[in-house]
Amino acid sequence: MRRPMVAGNWKMHGTRASVVELTQGLGNMSLPSGVEVAVFPPSLFVTQVIDGLEGKGINVGAQNSAVQPEQGALTGEVAPSQLAEVGCKYVLVGHSERRQIIGESDEVLNQKFAAAQKSGLTPVLCIGETLAEREAGETLKVVGRQLSSVIDAFGIKAFANAVIAYEPVWAIGTGLTASPQQAQDVHAAIRKQLAAMDAEVAANVQLLYGGSVKAANAAELFGMPDIDGGLIGGASLNADEFGAICRAAGN
C-alpha cells in the first residue's frame, strides 16, 4: 500500500531567524503516523534544517542539484552526492519554475534525475501543463511527454525509486487549484501510462498533487484514489497550516 506523503517546498524564502522559527514549529508538530513528511528549504539552509529536525520524523530534501553526481568544477551548483552526505533524502527535479524561468530542458532534467538516483537521493519529478495547454485540451499529452522523457531515457523501473508530483503550472502560487476530480483525472492517467509498462511500479509510486494546496482543500484532494499526498508551496511556510495539511493526509 502506498504511504501518503506531504512535502513542503519553501522555494526562495527564509532568513536565518525565520528558518529557525519554522523549523522549531515543525519539530513541535504532532505528526500523523504513516505519513511521510519532508521539507525542501533553500540550499543555504539545508544543513541547518536537517540539524533542527533531527529525531523529529521529518525528512529534508533539496530544491535542485547538479547534472553530475559527484563534486567537481561546476561553479554555483551542488552535487547530489554532497546533499546525500549531509543528510538529504529527496531532491526536486523539473519544477515548473526551473523549466520555465531557468529554461531547463528535458535532457538536463534527465541528467539531474539520474545523478540524484546514482547518489542515493530519491528524485521528486515535477510535471504539469500551462493554462494555455489545458485550455487547448493538451494536459494529458504534455504530462505524458514529460513522463516519457524519463522513461525513454532510463526505463520504467526508474520510477521504482522516485516520486511524481503533478503541478498544473496555472495553479502554482495563483490561488487557483484544480478541482479534486480534475486532479484525480490526471493522476489516474499518469498511473495508467506507467501501468501499461509495469503494473507493480504504477501501483507503488507515490503521486503528489501540487498547486495552491491549503488546509481547507487538502482533505478533499487527498481523498481521491490516485492522489497520495501533496507538494505544498506557500502553505508550507506556516507550521500550523502545514501541520493541518499533514493531518489531512493521515486521515
Curated annotation (Swiss-Prot):
Broad EC category: isomerase
Pathway listed: Carbohydrate biosynthesis; gluconeogenesis; Carbohydrate degradation; glycolysis; D-glyceraldehyde 3-phosphate from glycerone phosphate: step 1/1
Pfam short name (any one): TIM
MF terms (GO), sorted A to Z: triose-phosphate isomerase activity
Principal cellular location given in the protein's record: cytoplasm
Subcellular location: Cytoplasm
Record Gene3D superfamilies: Aldolase class I
Binding site for substrate: 9-11, 173, 212, 233-234
Statement: the UniProt record of this protein carries the keyword Lipid biosynthesis: no
Gene Ontology BP, a term: glycolytic process
GO cellular component: cytosol
EC number: 5.3.1.1
Catalytic activity from the UniProt record: D-glyceraldehyde 3-phosphate = dihydroxyacetone phosphate
Keywords from the UniProt entry: Cytoplasm, Gluconeogenesis, Glycolysis, Isomerase
Active site as annotated: 95 (electrophile), 167 (proton acceptor)
PANTHER family in the record: TRIOSEPHOSPHATE ISOMERASE
Listed HAMAP family: TIM_B
Family: Belongs to the triosephosphate isomerase family.
Subunit structure: Homodimer.
Function: Involved in the gluconeogenesis. Catalyzes stereospecifically the conversion of dihydroxyacetone phosphate (DHAP) to D-glyceraldehyde-3-phosphate (G3P).
Protein name, UniProt field: Triosephosphate isomerase
Organism: Pseudomonas entomophila (strain L48)
Organism taxonomic ancestry: Bacteria, Pseudomonadati, Pseudomonadota, Gammaproteobacteria, Pseudomonadales
